[in-house]
């Protein structure tokens, strides 16, 4: 399968740079997996699409202000993007500099260069950085960090992004990108879903900066997926098994929830799904056998990204590309701050041959 099979024309004007004034007021394109039929509506239509007893699975990760600016003590500006927090004093990060710092290099971070840190080791493309400060890593990031808006949102981060680029139910700090499908849920909508009898469960997947890395190979099968930490606790496993047992659907909110659930299913030894507390490198593309997820709420993804491949594996390649073509024609807003899709599973997707 070729990466170019997942390309589509997207006018620059359709990339959303700010979210809708009201979270749940975005548009919703519904794709019926088995037939490919499309329905245009509003995000709150989700209320009518879910049944009492259906299980919504959210990702409760919280985005950290992961972008830091500063310089090497020896001179030369640097930009640091935290990939993950290792402990209270250390981070693993991408560093942009005219010349990469060497182990032992002293870094002065923050717009006022008030934070002192040391680059202690290099692991491939990533740098280990230790803060020489009394405060915890999270406190330091909250005080000097910038929200790591995706590269295609072409503007500096603003104070408002600290909440806008965060789901209302976010709880566990550690992501450098928001699980964006969740951005459309506000408290009134969550309340109405609960009142209808829709069940809710929360996994945690700390989205890494790798989510924005382009696929740099021609053939999909050659792509090495980045690694992210995921937690699927026992209560989520119980909720999934209970929903399946009573004939209800498991609906993943976002591709990160999909990857968490399907990773836990892949690692399970005895049951359909078992608890998972581990890094995952799961790469879902056409031909993948889904085991857990029956429906998906997701945003519109970048051409040739691993995420449009995941959706194609779920709804079917042809149905997915047709939906994206319609979305462009109907001027839906794309990417992190854009509109959403509701997609039901297409069991025939696994048999589809792509690019032949």
UniProtKB/Swiss-Prot annotation:
<keyword id="KW-0963">Cytoplasm</keyword>
<keyword id="KW-0808">Transferase</keyword>
<dbReference type="InterPro" id="IPR042119">
    <property type="entry name" value="QueA_dom2"/>
</dbReference>
<comment type="function">
    <text>Transfers and isomerizes the ribose moiety from AdoMet to the 7-aminomethyl group of 7-deazaguanine (preQ1-tRNA) to give epoxyqueuosine (oQ-tRNA).</text>
</comment>
<dbReference type="GO" id="GO:0002099">
    <property type="term" value="P:tRNA wobble guanine modification"/>
</dbReference>
<dbReference type="InterPro" id="IPR042118">
    <property type="entry name" value="QueA_dom1"/>
</dbReference>
<keyword id="KW-0671">Queuosine biosynthesis</keyword>
<keyword id="KW-0949">S-adenosyl-L-methionine</keyword>
<dbReference type="InterPro" id="IPR036100">
    <property type="entry name" value="QueA_sf"/>
</dbReference>
<comment type="subunit">
    <text>Monomer.</text>
</comment>
<protein>
    <recommendedName>
        <fullName>S-adenosylmethionine:tRNA ribosyltransferase-isomerase</fullName>
        <ecNumber>2.4.99.17</ecNumber>
    </recommendedName>
</protein>
<dbReference type="Pfam" id="PF02547">
    <property type="entry name" value="Queuosine_synth"/>
</dbReference>
<dbReference type="InterPro" id="IPR003699">
    <property type="entry name" value="QueA"/>
</dbReference>
<comment type="similarity">
    <text>Belongs to the QueA family.</text>
</comment>
<dbReference type="GO" id="GO:0008616">
    <property type="term" value="P:queuosine biosynthetic process"/>
</dbReference>
<dbReference type="GO" id="GO:0005737">
    <property type="term" value="C:cytoplasm"/>
</dbReference>
<comment type="pathway">
    <text>tRNA modification; tRNA-queuosine biosynthesis.</text>
</comment>
<dbReference type="GO" id="GO:0051075">
    <property type="term" value="F:S-adenosylmethionine:tRNA ribosyltransferase-isomerase activity"/>
</dbReference>
